[in-house]
UniProtKB/Swiss-Prot annotation:
Residues 19-138 form the I-type lysozyme domain. Belongs to the glycosyl hydrolase 22 family. Type-I lysozyme subfamily. This is Invertebrate-type lysozyme 6. Expressed in pharyngeal gland cells and duct projections, coelomocytes and intestine. The keyword Protein biosynthesis does not apply. The active site is at E28, D39. Keywords: Antibiotic, Antimicrobial, Bacteriolytic enzyme, Disulfide bond, Glycosidase, Hydrolase, Signal. Disulfide bonds join C20-C106, C25-C31, C36-C45, C58-C86, C76-C82, C98-C120.
Amino acid sequence: MFVKLCGILAFAVTYASSDCLQCICKKESECKPVGCNDDVGSLSCGYYQIKLSYYKDCGQPGKRAGESVEAAWRRCSDELDCASTCVQSYYNRYKKQCAGTGQGACEIMARNHNGGPRGCKKSATLGYWNGIKGLGCS
């Protein structure tokens, strides 16, 4: 029974994260490959407006042999599957920082996406989270 319950909970978290990814994508770019934009002194690129440091933290998905990290970041950010993999990997890497906050998977994903590894604990990310909830995610 315990194993079955764990499987159901794992499916629910994955499903919530998939819906949440769509809401974050919509909030950041209307889910379009928008290229790079200046964002508080550094560039944010693509579907999820990913910064270079975030791309490095998410494990540099899609980086090709011989490709510079910067070129891979710009390209990956404008490819929906690659960018989604990056956001999901970033969430998986830093979600443990939010243990004990009582926040659901989507709130953790959204607030960390907006505010960095401990974004779930920053009051500055509450407005972003409210915007995600306004898109129908929770």
